[in-house]
């Protein structure tokens, strides 16, 4: 589809989403104080498809995505559903760097949610995007490490995978200490892989010291 046609298809979707975000919009399909969250989710998914391979569409929807990210109530489950779709859209299109950081920060906030499913999908998504913007994910390292102590084994597993990915020359010593603490209480199924990763981290740390003058 030509860029001009994609942009034309985008405009009415953006306008509708703006209306849904407006407090003056008719609340006929209100759910927990949020206007028609199901339609908002569908529009975000459609925008994701349109903007995935189009710089023009991505530029056209950056502003509305920022509005959704900042104005949606995260204290409600329906709000979190909208925010998650917004995050996925931001991360899949050619979004501004600042908008990507905003999306990753939303995922970081999800890690503190009491809902296991929300924490899990946040970790899963962070694992997928850490290679895109490692620095933005690193800012949430403390919260990610807290997830190593989560009661849910699937959350601990995802947090551990993400922790491995975050290890670099500047934090290898601190993260190795965290992994050693986790090893003491880790489930049996984690120990072999965890020990291997600790050995790799230790080797990296020794190489850093060897290279130092």
For each of these PLM feature ranges, what is it?
Residues 33-47, 82-86:
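Extended HEAT/HEAT-like alpha-solenoid repeat tracts in very large eukaryotic scaffold/adaptor proteins
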Residues 6, 10, 40, 58, ...:
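Residue-level detector of extended alpha-helical repeat arrays and alpha-solenoid scaffolds
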Residues 1, 17, 47-51, 86-94, ...:
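Hydrophobic residues within the alpha-helices of tandem HEAT/HEAT-like
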Residues 11-29, 33, 66-74, 105-112, ...:
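HEAT/HEAT-like alpha-solenoid repeats
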Residues 5, 9, 57-61, 95, ...:
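Structural marker for long, regular alpha helices in very large eukaryotic proteins
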Residues 49, 53-64, 75-99, 114, ...:
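Alpha-solenoid helical repeat scaffolds
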Residues 208-213:
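Residue-level detector of conserved catalytic or cofactor/ligand-binding positions
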């Amino acid at each position: 589809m030509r860029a001009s046609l994609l942009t034309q298809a985008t405009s009415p979707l953006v306008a509708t989403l703006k209306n849904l975000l407006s407090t003056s919009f008719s609340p006929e399909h209100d759910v927990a104080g949020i206007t028609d969250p199901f339609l908002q989710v569908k529009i975000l998914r459609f925008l994701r498809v349109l903007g995935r391979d189009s710089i023009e569409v991505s530029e056209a929807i950056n502003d509305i995505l920022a509005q959704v990210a900042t104005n949606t109530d995260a204290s409600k489950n329906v709000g979190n559903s909208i925010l998650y779709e917004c995050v996925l859209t931001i991360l899949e299109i050619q979004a501004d760097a600042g908008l990507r950081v905003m999306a990753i920060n939303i995922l970081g906030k999800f890690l503190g949610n009491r809902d296991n499913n929300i924490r899990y999908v946040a970790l899963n998504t962070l694992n997928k995007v850490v290679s895109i913007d490692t620095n933005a994910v690193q800012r949430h390292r403390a919260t990610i490490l807290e997830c190593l102590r989560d009661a849910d084994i699937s959350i601990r597993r995802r947090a551990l995978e993400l922790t491995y990915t975050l290890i670099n020359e500047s934090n290898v010593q601190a993260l190795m200490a965290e992994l050693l603490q986790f090893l003491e209480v880790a489930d049996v199924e984690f120990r072999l892989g965890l020990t291997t990763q600790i050995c790799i981290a230790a080797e990296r740390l020794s190489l850093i010291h060897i290279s130092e003058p």
